[in-house]
């Protein structure tokens, strides 16, 4: 029986029937992806295999168009409803825009913004949507240039009259992109990042709920850059996280994203669409649109570990890097052996921001001698800023000014909600 990767087949073995799409398989075997999301493998000579059309009926070559070929699929219906708020969906790729590629068995970014809209019909009741593909990549391939291209596209959509923006994005580096846009754009409307932990063809996919909740936030009064993702492992509500205070805290759970050193801005109830807020936020229209691009890519995070060779800092200084984020222990400490190397970096006009590996809590280098020595060497306390956010902030600040003293001053300011005045327990 002839079949190829991507074909739908019915397999019978010992009276049990299995259906699914053919995946890459070893010679003499067939592996299928079943509707449940699980894979099943069989020895070809021990099963009966029947090719199926997409509707599950056995293929006979007579109802699929000329010469047994499938008729072209009808054009996707545009999801649009005039009179509702105008929301632009900008797709960059990631799991929310992914499905299984049956040529390789891997998850690939194959959907566009319009595909997402067509796949989730509930969206058309919320807003009048416009889809725009910015890229189709997994988020590990995003970089500072990608952030700036995305930011420009967001600004263009707002200037064109969008009442809200949704950015579909891979979850692994979504916090970096959200932070980058938080620093680059002052926005009068919501800019909502959303993704999913599980691809659209898996029964446990979180893409639909996350997208629907993101749409609710995109038409809300919350005019900030935010991340909207599952609040629990159940399909009950999503949390709204400030773009500079959010972090992915689990590799695969649907509720992987958490606000750190802050409460979420609020929650969105999946069933009712009700938004509850917990902390102050910038309201719709409170700020005029401002766009300040510019990112210095030659910045890095250095994680201190016991016994680590401090000369690694010299590698960055001699390599022409412009700024460093140190992940210190506890309150923000490194070994005393690192102090001269920090001083050399600062003397080379390289800002050095200190954050904590603890994530929760605030850096305070005025308690112990080592911390005081770090400050004397010129290190900058990152307060309660996340290391990843500190890196993006550093890149953005150095993209705005070449003056060392001005950069140091800006890095100590709360520019986009990345620093809280008081530490949250």
Curated annotation (Swiss-Prot):
Regions annotated as coiled coil: none
Subunit structure: Heterodimer of GatD and GatE.
Gene that encodes the chain: gatD
Domain Asparaginase/glutaminase residues, every copy: 85-414
GO biological process entries: amino acid metabolic process; regulation of translational fidelity; translation
Species of the source: Methanosarcina mazei (strain ATCC BAA-159 / DSM 3647 / Goe1 / Go1 / JCM 11833 / OCM 88) (Methanosarcina frisia)
Record's function text: Allows the formation of correctly charged Gln-tRNA(Gln) through the transamidation of misacylated Glu-tRNA(Gln) in organisms which lack glutaminyl-tRNA synthetase. The reaction takes place in the presence of glutamine and ATP through an activated gamma-phospho-Glu-tRNA(Gln). The GatDE system is specific for glutamate and does not act on aspartate.
PROSITE patterns: ASN_GLN_ASE_1, ASN_GLN_ASE_2, ASN_GLN_ASE_3
Region (Disordered): 53-84
Keywords: ATP-binding, Ligase, Nucleotide-binding, Protein biosynthesis
HAMAP family: GatD
Pfam assignment, any one: GatD_N
Catalytic activity from the UniProt record: L-glutamyl-tRNA(Gln) + L-glutamine + ATP + H2O = L-glutaminyl-tRNA(Gln) + L-glutamate + ADP + phosphate + H(+)
This protein's name: Glutamyl-tRNA(Gln) amidotransferase subunit D
Bias kind Basic and acidic residues: ranges: 68-80
GO molecular-function term, one example from the UniProt record: ATP binding
Gene3D superfamilies: 2.30.30.520, 3.40.50.40, L-asparaginase, N-terminal domain
Uppermost EC category: ligase
Organism phylogeny: Archaea, Methanobacteriati, Methanobacteriota, Stenosarchaea group, Methanomicrobia
Catalytic residues (UniProt): 95, 171-172, 248
Similarity-based family: Belongs to the asparaginase 1 family. GatD subfamily.
InterPro entries according to UniProt: AsnA_fam, Asp/glu_Ase-like_sf, Asparaginase/glutaminase-like, Asparaginase/glutaminase_AS1, Asparaginase/glutaminase_AS2, Asparaginase_C, GatD, GatD_N
Assigned EC number: 6.3.5.-
């Amino acid at each position: 029986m002839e079949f190829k990767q991507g074909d739908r087949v019915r397999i019978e073995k010992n009276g049990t029937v299995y259906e699914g799409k053919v995946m890459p398989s070893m010679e003499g075997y067939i592996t299928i992806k079943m509707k449940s999301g699980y894979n099943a493998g069989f020895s070809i000579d021990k099963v009966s295999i029947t090719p199926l059309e997409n509707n599950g009926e056995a293929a006979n070559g007579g109802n699929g168009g000329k010469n047994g070929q499938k008729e072209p699929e009808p054009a996707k219906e545009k999801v649009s409803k005039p009179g509702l708020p105008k929301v632009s969906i900008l797709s960059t790729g990631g799991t929310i825009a992914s499905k299984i590629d049956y040529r390789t068995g891997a998850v690939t970014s194959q959907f566009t913004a319009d595909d997402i809209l067509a796949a989730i019909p509930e969206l058309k009741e919320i807003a009048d949507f416009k889809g725009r593909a910015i890229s189709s990549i997994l988020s590990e391939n995003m970089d500072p240039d990608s952030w700036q291209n995305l930011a420009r596209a967001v600004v263009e959509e707002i200037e064109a009259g969008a009442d809200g923006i949704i950015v579909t994005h891979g979850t692994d580096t979504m916090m970096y992109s959200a932070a980058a846009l938080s620093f680059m754009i002052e926005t009068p409307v919501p800019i909502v990042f959303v993704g999913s932990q599980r691809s659209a063809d898996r029964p446990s996919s979180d893409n639909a709920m996350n997208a629907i909740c993101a749409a609710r936030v995109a038409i809300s009064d919350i005019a900030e850059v935010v991340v909207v993702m599952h609040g629990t492992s159940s399909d009950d509500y999503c949390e709204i996280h400030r773009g500079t205070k959010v972090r992915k805290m689990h590799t695969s759970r649907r509720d992987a994203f958490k606000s750190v050193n802050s409460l979420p801005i609020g929650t969105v109830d999946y069933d009712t669409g009700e938004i509850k807020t917990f902390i102050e936020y910038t309201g719709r229209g409170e700020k005029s649109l401002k766009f300040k691009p510019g990112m210095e890519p030659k910045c890095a995070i250095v994680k201190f570990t016991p016994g680590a060779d401090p000369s690694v800092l010299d590698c960055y200084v001699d390599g022409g890097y412009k700024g460093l984020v140190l992940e210190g222990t506890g309150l923000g400490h490194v070994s005393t052996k690192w102090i001269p190397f920090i001083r050399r970096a600062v003397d080379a006009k390289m800002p050095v921001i200190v954050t904590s590996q603890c994530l929760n809590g605030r850096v305070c280098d005025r308690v112990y001698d080592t911390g005081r020595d770090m400050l004397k060497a010129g290190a900058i306390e990152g307060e309660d800023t996340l290391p990843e956010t500190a890196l993006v902030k550093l890149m953005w600040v150095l993209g705005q000014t070449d003056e060392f003293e001005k950069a140091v001053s800006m890095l100590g300011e709360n520019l986009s909600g990345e620093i809280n005045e008081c530490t949250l327990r």
